Each structure stands twice: as C-alpha cells, then as structure tokens.
Amino acid sequence: MEKEATPQQQPPVVDPARLKQLNLAIETLEKQFGKGAIMRLGDDSAVMHVQVISTGSMALDYALGVGGLPRGRVTEIYGPESSGKTTLALHAIAEAQKNGGIAALVDAEHAFDPTYARKLGVDINALLVSQPESGEQALSIVETLVRSGAVDIIVIDSVAALVPQAELEGEMGDSVVGLQARLMSQALRKLTGAISKSSSVCLFINQLRDKIGVMYGSPETTTGGKALKFYSSVRLDIRKIAQIKDGEELVGNRTKVKVVKNKVAPPFKTAEFDILYGEGISVLGELIDLAVEFGIIKKSGAWFSYGTEKLGQGRENVKKLLKEDETLRNTIRQQVRDMLTGAPTA
C-alpha cells in the first residue's frame, strides 16, 4: 500500500495580541539602544554573510573557510619569535588598504619598521600608527577607533608589550601577578560588543611563553591570561618549519599556519607558504604550490609543465617565468581561485 502524503506543516499562528506586545517591546528597545539592538534572524537587516579582509595568502584565506579574517570579530595570531606574525598582520593591512580601507597599527612594542612595511605593500602615508606608553592607553585607543566605525583593521602588536600602568609606576622586582590578565579581561569585555557592531577586524599579535612544571601536554602558553583565547573568534598558530636557501645564502622561511580556533568556519585547517626576507609572503611560490596541488601545473621530477607547455626545471625558474609572463600568471591564478572557491574552471 502506498503511504499517504503527509500534509506540510504550517507554522504555528502567533496570537495577534502577543505579537503586538512584542513589536511594542522591540520598538522600545530600538529607541533606547538604537536600531539593530534586537532583530529577527530572518530579517534582511540581520547580517548572515561574514565579511572578511584577505590575509594576503590564498592558502590561508582558504584554510579560514570564509576567505580571510572576519570583520566584526577578534582575531589572535601567535607563535615563536621571528615566525612571521607581524609580517602576516602587515599583509592583512596592505590588503585592506588595496580595497580602499583604513588601517591602524597600535605598536606597543615600539618596533615598527616603515621601510619593511612599504615593501609588503602597506601605504605608509595612510597608515594610522600609535605607540602608546601603557596597556591602558593602548586599549583605550583601540576602543575609540573601533567605536568610530571608520577603521577597517586594527592591529595590536603585541599583547606581551601591553604593560599595565601600575607596573610602569612600580619598582623593578615588584610583584605584578595577574595585572595584565585583569587588564585584558576588562578591556575585551568592553571591546567585543563594540567590535561586533562595527566592520573592523581587531587583530591581536601574541607571543609564546613556557609554563613551568608541565610534564604532560604542551608547555607553551600565550601571554595576557585566558580572556583573549575566549573572546577570539579566530586563533592562528604560525611557525617556521624550514629554511629557504639560494645556494648557501638564507633567503627566507617555509611557514605553516594552523587555524586552532574558528567560530565562523570549521577549524584545524592548515596553510603553508614561503616568507622571503625583505619581501614577505611569496605570492608566486604559493601560486605554484597550489597549482601543483590541484593538478593545474604538472610536476615530473624537477620539471614543471602547464598543459603541453614546459614551464621550466626547478621551482625558482618557474617563479621567474611567471613573474615575467603576466598573461600566464593571471590564467593560472584564476584557475587556482576557481578550485579554492569551488567554481567551475573554464
């Protein structure tokens, strides 16, 4: 016997009197706290799509699942010294500026190098830079910039350098246990709400420390307490995995980034790319790696080929060819992007 088709369930009818009371309550809340203080998730005004700023690395944008660093969220980049944390942040600043965005750098370490930033594509003349004297001043500047709603990306370099005022005013050797953690916890409680209402990317750079007496598990931890781990929507762990040499000369590092936390897409994905000294992320090197991975460029031994055309022997020679041949470079880049986004290739 054929089963009878069950009639499609209609949504329950809400009592008009209750609906009227609800609408009055929503109007009152919007008058008191502004439009968007409360909304139905199905309304057009409720933003469902995550807006992003590119990291400057196609592989990392893909690993993040949404195409870049999410706007209106807190992101943390951490790793050992000289692993590429600031380089990655400067690339994100450059990408924001390329699209007409405003970028700010809160340089708590007082170590910003404008010459290097310019080489990575950062517009130094348009970049807002602050070198605060204390952690409270730095986080107050961040809050003001976020609440302005005019800044696209704010980078704080770094959490470890956000020294509380009480520590600065004290003597060397004074006990300051938990001061920075309390400062970060208080600041992030205030900041996250403001950031979510803005379209800013708030990017904290953090350092690693070793926990004493850890026998099992990783002894590594980040500075500034647990608040940043909790409030971050995205956490990126960046590490050097190999050195890049040109003959005997050291020219860069092979870098691996792991997405250890992601609230906007599935986490635990990884991306690998080259960071070259004085140049930053090697866009051509990454393009070749992704093209080989997706089978767009074929690799046989040391030889690389595209279709029936031999590109050259060795990765460095292929990079030189792609640098000179703009048409071929753009064709391969578009095919790689299509593979990353799932679009059909031509």
Curated annotation (Swiss-Prot):
Q: Which UniProt keywords apply?
A: ATP-binding, Cytoplasm, DNA damage, DNA recombination, DNA repair, DNA-binding, Nucleotide-binding, SOS response
Query: Which top-rank group of organisms is this from?
Result: Bacteria
Q: What InterPro entries is this protein classified in?
A: AAA+_ATPase (IPR003593), DNA_recomb/repair_RecA (IPR013765), DNA_recomb/repair_RecA_CS (IPR020584), P-loop_NTPase (IPR027417), RecA-like_C (IPR049261), RecA-like_N (IPR049428), RecA_ATP-bd (IPR020588), RecA_C_sf (IPR023400)
Q: What CDD domains has UniProt attached to this entry?
A: RecA
Task: Provide the binding site for ATP.
Answer: 79-86
Question: Per the record, GO CC terms?
Answer: cytosol
Gene Ontology MF annotations: ATP binding; ATP hydrolysis activity; ATP-dependent DNA damage sensor activity; damaged DNA binding; single-stranded DNA binding
Which compartment or compartments is the protein found in? Cytoplasm
GO BP annotations of the record are: DNA recombination; DNA repair; SOS response
Show the PANTHER family listed in the entry. MITOCHONDRIAL DNA REPAIR PROTEIN RECA HOMOLOG-RELATED, RECA
The role this protein plays is: Can catalyze the hydrolysis of ATP in the presence of single-stranded DNA, the ATP-dependent uptake of single-stranded DNA by duplex DNA, and the ATP-dependent hybridization of homologous single-stranded DNAs. It interacts with LexA causing its activation and leading to its autocatalytic cleavage.
The family note in this entry says: Belongs to the RecA family.
Q: What is this protein called?
A: Protein RecA
Per the UniProt record, the source organism is: Chlorobaculum tepidum (strain ATCC 49652 / DSM 12025 / NBRC 103806 / TLS) (Chlorobium tepidum)
Give the encoding gene's name: recA
